[in-house]
Design a protein with these regions (language model features):
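Membrane-embedded, lumen/periplasm-facing catalytic core of multi-pass transferases
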Residues: 157, 355-421, 427-429, 435, ...
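Perimembrane helix-loop-helix junctions
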Residues: 3-5, 11, 181-219, 287-293
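Signature aromatic-anchored transmembrane alpha helix within multi-pass, membrane-resident enzymes
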Residues: 20-21, 215-219, 273-279, 288-311, ...
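Transmembrane-helix motifs of polytopic, lipid-linked glycan transferases
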Residues: 20, 94-114
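Membrane-lumen/periplasm interface segments of specific transmembrane helices
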Residues: 29-30, 183, 192-193, 207-281, ...
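Specific aromatic-rich, kink-prone transmembrane helix
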Residues: 104-106, 126-130, 145-164, 168, ...
Length: 535
């Protein structure tokens, strides 16, 4: 850790409270229409129930959902927030906006520190509007907190404020265990940098040993958590299925290569990020602009190497580990890519603010327009469409079939059985299937006596025009390595289950449908208590 990197610590600590307040205010205004949405996907499936368990019992090991060994910092924060306020989606999402504002303040601090205030403001605006960051700003996931503490930790690292950096990296790892990769990458960089500068003899120097020893420290609180989790549950890294899905099933050379390609796309092109990265790449062909008789200052090469080490370490780690290749896992380093590109534009393009405005317009477009290939709805406002459809489906079931047994898949199985998630007032009896592809539904069709209606929905986003349809082998690869499947259409599912579609709705590629099983319909027709006016 050295100030020779080009960081300017004297300026970085000024005016950050107003930056945080302004960031939160603008985020709150932009996200106001989303604050009351019920909980979505992994929120509903794990993170909200885990935090709710902690609120009610004080125990960091959840009981209403499986423990997957994620560190408890975010759930502790939410439990305290609910205890001081209210347990509602709006309250929860406001709390997550505070975390997002903290992350943006860290982006501003870091960018102003290594570049200048103009680059800092532009980087913050681009980051806030980048679809993945925008969508994640109100969602109860761990990645935003990990990003916030990692970015602040990097800022202090570049100022050579070792203990502050170590503390923040430790908090990042307690927010999400994968965040430990940042201090590990910096530790390796501290060992390699002297070799590059002065040869192998420098590895044993006192400064190198001191920095390396301190950068191990963020792992200690995380290790203590894993030991505590193992003592309580018998598993160090979570339940066996969680470990299989995220570790043992991913250690295939071809899968690692394919995941690496997807991670590269996430870092340079995903959700219209290519508008910024391509613009910066083209700008590199231009000479630096001059301020007076001096060329505009670039981000110090040493700082760029630090950023590169952390970015590459994150991409490599997430190519090897993690069953779901989600863009939000890269939130701690995506702002670094944005910062490097914005700084390049400012240094070489005279009308760079207009280019940044074009980039922001592209990001807004990415929020509103889905890409022509399958993607995770949580990466833009498609998650809003999903939640609205599922809430309307739950309302329909409550009005028409309040006592029905419902065949469905996760996470709707949780949405219908846990009123605390915001979809229904009273729990339904649910029969769960893995998904709505042909094999699980064929198995369900052999025992239609166990359910009365089926709630089907798009478990995988399928655009009407899918670019990957031009590559049939790509779908086979996705099925083999990335848990991909195609859902049956509601009509095909109804024929297989022996029922009929009684309600269906669709929004921008997301759909939901209710199928009434003919056996249940016949029972109603012959029942003296049938109430045809129940709506």
């Amino acid at each position: 850790m050295s100030q020779s990197s080009g960081a300017r610590p004297g300026r970085a600590g000024l005016g950050l409270v107003p930056v945080f307040a302004l960031s939160f205010t603008l985020l709150f205004a932009l996200h106001a229409p989303l604050l009351r949405l019920p909980y979505f996907w992994d929120e509903a499936g794990h993170f909200v129930p885990a935090a709710r368990d902690l609120l009610l019992s004080g125990d960091p090991i959840p009981t209403s959902t499986l423990s997957n060994a994620h560190p408890p910092l975010v759930t502790v924060f939410l439990a305290l927030w609910w205890k001081l306020g209210a347990y509602t989606p709006a309250s929860t999402r406001t709390a997550m906006l505070l975390v997002a504002a903290l992350a943006l303040t860290g982006v501003f601090r870091l960018a102003r520190q290594v570049a200048n205030p103009q680059v800092a403001v532009a980087t913050v605006v681009c980051t806030a509007l980048y679809p993945v960051f925008f969508a994640q700003s109100t969602l109860v996931h761990l990645d935003m907190a990990a990003a916030a503490f990692t970015l602040w930790g990097l800022s202090f690292y570049l100022e050579d404020r070792r203990w502050a950096a170590v503390s923040l990296f430790a908090l990042a790892a307690l927010a999400k265990e994968t965040a430990i990769v940042a201090p590990v990458a910096l530790l390796l960089w501290e060992l390699v940098r002297p070799v590059l500068a002065r040869g192998w003899a420098a590895v044993g120097s006192e400064p190198a040993r001191r920095s390396a020893s301190l950068l191990w420290l963020p792992a200690l609180p995380l290790a203590l958590w894993f030991l505590y989790h193992a003592q309580r549950t018998g598993y160090i890294f979570g339940n066996p299925e969680f470990v299989r899905y995220n570790v043992s099933a991913t250690l295939d050379p071809l899968r690692i290569l394919l995941a690496g390609l997807r991670r590269t796309w996430h870092l340079i092109g995903y959700m219209n990020l290519f508008v910024l990265t391509a613009g910066a790449a083209m700008a590199l062909r231009l000479p630096p602009l001059a301020d007076g008789d001096q060329p505009r200052r670039r981000i110090d090469v040493g700082v760029q190497m630090v950023f590169g080490a952390v970015i590459l370490a994150y991409a490599a780690m997430l190519s090897v580990l993690g069953g779901a290749v989600l863009a939000r896992y890269l939130l701690p380093v995506t702002p670094l890519v944005i910062l490097l590109c914005v700084s390049t534009l400012r240094r070489r393009v005279r009308q760079w603010p207009w280019v940044v405005a074009l980039v922001c317009a592209g990001f807004v477009g990415g929020l509103l327009v889905n890409p022509p290939y399958p993607f995770a709805p949580e990466d833009n406002l498609a998650y809003r469409d999903y939640v609205i459809l599922h809430k309307r489906a739950a309302d329909y079931l409550a009005a028409r079939y309040p006592h029905a047994r419902v065949l469905t898949a996760w996470p709707a199985s949780d949405e219908l059985t846990k009123p605390l998630l915001g979809y229904t007032r009273a729990p339904f009896a649910v029969v769960a299937v893995e998904n709505f592809s042909a094999a699980p539904l064929a198995a369900a069709a052999r025992d239609t006596s166990s359910y009365d209606v089926a709630l089907l929905f798009s478990t995988k986003y399928q655009p009407e025009t899918n670019l990957f349809d031009l590559l049939p082998f790509w779908e086979r690869i996705q099925e083999r390595y990335f848990d991909y499947h195609r859902d049956l259409s509601p009509e095909d599912a109804a024929r297989m289950l022996g029922g009929r579609v009684v309600w269906r709705e669709q929004r921008r590629g997301e759909w939901v449908a209710v199928i009434e099983i003919e056996r249940a319909l016949n029972a109603q027709l012959h029942s003296p208590r049938m109430n045809t006016d129940q709506h």
